[in-house]
Amino acid sequence: MAKKKQNTENYLAQNRKARFNYAIAETFEAGISLTGTEIKSVRAGQITIGDGFVTIHNGNALLTNVHISSYVQGNQFNVDPLRTRQLLLHKREIRVLEKATQEQGVTIVPLKVYLKHGFAKVLVGIGRGKKKYDKREDIKKRDQERELSRRFKN
């Protein structure tokens, strides 16, 4: 009998600052519409999502300000590294995202980029911007957890 492959979460890019700067309420998994040279660059890990965000325009979810480096062997087929890319979501998911962004202070941010069954996927989250004191509370909690883990380790 064939062995099942283990589900190892292998992230190509992760937006660590997103959970620090935003309170993430809900997440969605979306496909990304990429060209051939772009997917090769993504598989090589040449993607930066730190400054990225998602906009809804004419019923389409668009990933903006995400940098995918040019593929080295791609020459004439390379495209603009910062071009806007379409996210592949169901219509009801797009409606939920569009309704959420109608509120003041709510944005859609990419959290992680990973491969799933050979396809590039992005995990996007609906986030509300945190205040400075909320960020300080998060830092205090994190420091307390580290201190507890050190005590239990020794």
UniProtKB/Swiss-Prot annotation:
InterPro entries: SmpB (IPR023620), SsrA-bd_prot (IPR000037), SsrA-bd_prot_CS (IPR020081). It is found in: Cytoplasm. Pfam families: SmpB (PF01668). One of its GO terms (molecular function) is RNA binding. GO terms for biological process: trans-translation. Disulfide bonds: none annotated. PROSITE patterns: SSRP (PS01317). GO terms for cellular component: cytosol. Gene3D superfamilies: 2.40.280.10. Residues 134-154 are annotated as: Disordered. Keywords: Cytoplasm, RNA-binding. SUPFAM superfamilies: Small protein B (SmpB) (SSF74982). CDD domains: SmpB. Required for rescue of stalled ribosomes mediated by trans-translation. Binds to transfer-messenger RNA (tmRNA), required for stable association of tmRNA with ribosomes. tmRNA and SmpB together mimic tRNA shape, replacing the anticodon stem-loop with SmpB. tmRNA is encoded by the ssrA gene; the 2 termini fold to resemble tRNA(Ala) and it encodes a 'tag peptide', a short internal open reading frame. During trans-translation Ala-aminoacylated tmRNA acts like a tRNA, entering the A-site of stalled ribosomes, displacing the stalled mRNA. Belongs to the SmpB family. PANTHER family: SSRA-BINDING PROTEIN, TMRNA-BINDING COMPONENT OF TRANS-TRANSLATION TAGGING COMPLEX. This is SsrA-binding protein. It comes from Leuconostoc mesenteroides subsp. mesenteroides (strain ATCC 8293 / DSM 20343 / BCRC 11652 / CCM 1803 / JCM 6124 / NCDO 523 / NBRC 100496 / NCIMB 8023 / NCTC 12954 / NRRL B-1118 / 37Y). The gene is smpB.
